[in-house]
Amino acid sequence: MTVRVTTLKGADAGRYYTERLPSYYLDGDEPPGRWWGQGADRLGLRDEIDPEAFLAVMAGQDPTTGEDLGRRYGEESVRGYDATFSAPKSVSVRFARGDEEIQREVVLAHERAVEAVLGWAESHAHTRLRRRGHIVCEDAEGIVVGVFRQHTSRRLDPQLHTHAVIANRVPAHDGRWLALDARTIKLDQRTLSALYHANLRTELTRRLGVGWRTPEHGIAEIADVDDDVLAEFSQRTHDVQRRLGEKIGRFRADLGRDPTEKERWKLEREAVLDSRPAKPHGPTLTELRREWRARVRALGRGSERVIQSMIGRQRGLEGIDSGTAVLLADAAIGSLAESQSSWRPAELVRELAAVTPTTVTVDSEQLTEFLQRLADHAASTRYMDISRPAPAGMPLRRDGRPITEAAVDRALTTESILAEEEQLIAWSDRRQGAVSPHTRLLTIDSNGGLNPGQVEAAAAATSARGLELIVGPAGAGKTTTLATAVAHLHMEGRSVFGVAPTAAAAEVLATETGMLADTLDKLLTEHHHPHRPAEPSYSLPPGTTIIVDEAGTAATTKLADLARLADQHDWRVVLVGDPRQFSAVGRGGMFAHLIETHAAVELDQVHRFRHQWERQASLRLRAGDPNVLTEYERRGRLHGGTLGHMHADI
């Protein structure tokens, strides 16, 4: 993702852009900022930014009259949002190495892409206000944006990027100036990024005939820029990636798994901030271009020749026909359905932009409008709207939704997703109601060192019922409980097989419980192989107990596949996990739903900690009780300091 939105707070929030940004990277060579947006037009703000006018807007005042634009800001009030658009490195290299015409076209392509995204954001801008005792979300009549284009990174590599500073004041339909409801741009940074990159590609392809590599997560580099050139001019990226690698390594060590896409995005944001160097002063853009050319020549003639020859390869290509539009919608829906049970319309726009062919050559404004129309059409014809019903007679926004519904609250899904979830729920109902729980273990292990919760959970794991649900918080003795249950099943001559989210976790599960175990993926794959039956070790007899460890991490589709296999082979299933620990990689959430709606046993006594207070505190922390931090602080368990000091202390 290369569009990031940063919240700007405090009285000095605007000074960085007028006093420090123009000379922080280059010696006065950066262009002045300019105004953008219908909100700016309402204030008479056009063309080049006057620093005093910009500071007035960021202070929440009309630059002409000095009057407050709505409620006066407090000392720490949010003043605006910096949406930073950063071009792929190959585009910046193309700018750095091009002649005047090439540089002009690259800059225009970048600017048109930024403006197209800002136009999309403006059309979706809202404000919140109280009306008749209710908080409502109404359309804003424009936004006020200060646009500042820059050409280098903090390490003085070529890096074409733009700071679009969106003021936290928007005009409402009644003429008042109110706060921007920024939830959309904050939540949908990935949508802004996908739109920017799709538009940048179409503009550069249209203007210069540029060809592209295959996009990854919606981002693509120019095809004929060699990797060694990209690496040479990516010092800042290397800094961030090195820091990100350290963070991911610690994440894996602490949690025993890879971060999800959302978790990785958060780690990347932290890495960007942690690795940020002091801003340099110094050379002019002309001087830097000479240096950049020398660095390219030092890589060899091949890299120089590649840069000079990457123009004009894709000229003459056209737009998107109806058949391509259908394929785009299918691809976007498939991508969303893999990872989410429901999504917002903006997320659909994001996926459509990400899968837009790199050969498209329509104008960026036309492309953005097309993607929005395609998303609207898909939402009305191919999805089910599961948002809260609108009250009768409620006024509607431009998007056709009631003003009582926040823009971020609308939820869409597909019939197939709902059907899959409903089938799992029905399967769970049938499985739990079929046979009464087997309770002999309660007597057998009454003196075996287990607490009552563990005894109950072990009894459930060894029952004759077709489905059992066990909630096991960290440190609550889950492994001991399962080992006891497995021993009892073996003693009765009953088959048992364990599955875990990773091969390493499955190996630990097998070692600590004494049962055969593998990954859920492996078990499913063995029974879905098109050309051979399952391997003997996976050909489990009827009555086998399948223990699914860390069931909260299992994707819904995989649980549904397991349910079908269990019915087909007459297996019983025990789902064990903690929905408050790990989330599914992919579309999940069914384990959490099942334990809320079906009979479940919960291990409620923590054994991992030596002190009783910490056992209780860990359960409060798991439940999300913020007041438990007071207990940790009172016990001297909270420590602070710089990042370096904290690492040293650990």
What are these regions (language model features)?
Residues 481, 485:
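Hydrophobic positions on the alpha1 helix immediately C-terminal to the Walker A/P-loop
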